[in-house]
Amino acid sequence: LYPGDSYVDWVALDGYNWGALKWGWQSFTDVFTMGLKEIKAIAPGKPLAIAEIGCTPGTGKAAWVTDSFAKAQAAGARMLVWFEHNKETDWRLSSDAQVAAAAKTAATQPGWVSGGDYNKVKAALGL
C-alpha cells in the first residue's frame, strides 16, 4: 500500500539470485523486471533504490554483479545495497577477489549515490 508522495522520499526493491538453492540461476532482469514495473507505476518520479540484492556463489557471479549494477542503474536506481552476509549461502562480494573487483568497478561508476555524500542525496531527491 503506497501512502502517497508526500510521505515517501525513496522507493526500493530487494531481490536475490538464489541459483541452484531455489529456482536456478536468474539474471537481474529475471529477478527484478516485474517489481520494477510495478514500483514505477505506483511511484513515478521517486528516487529508486535496490535495498537488498545478492547472488549465490558460482563461476558467473562476477559477471552477474557487473550486469546487475549496470541494469539497476539503467532502470533508474541511484543506490544499491548488497546483502554482504554468509547466511543461507555465501552472498558476500568479499568472498571472492574477482567478484569484489567487479563490484568495486561497478560501484564507482558515475550516477550512484555514495554513503555520506549529502549533496548527491539531495540531488537525487531533487532538493
Residue ranges and their predicted role:
Residues 1-12, 63-65, 69:
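Substrate-binding cleft/loops of secretory-pathway carbohydrate-active enzymes
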Residues 6-59:
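Glycoside hydrolase catalytic-domain groove-lining segments
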Residues 46-127:
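Substrate-binding cleft of secreted/luminal carbohydrate-active enzymes
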Residues 2, 16-18, 82-83, 118:
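Aromatic side chains
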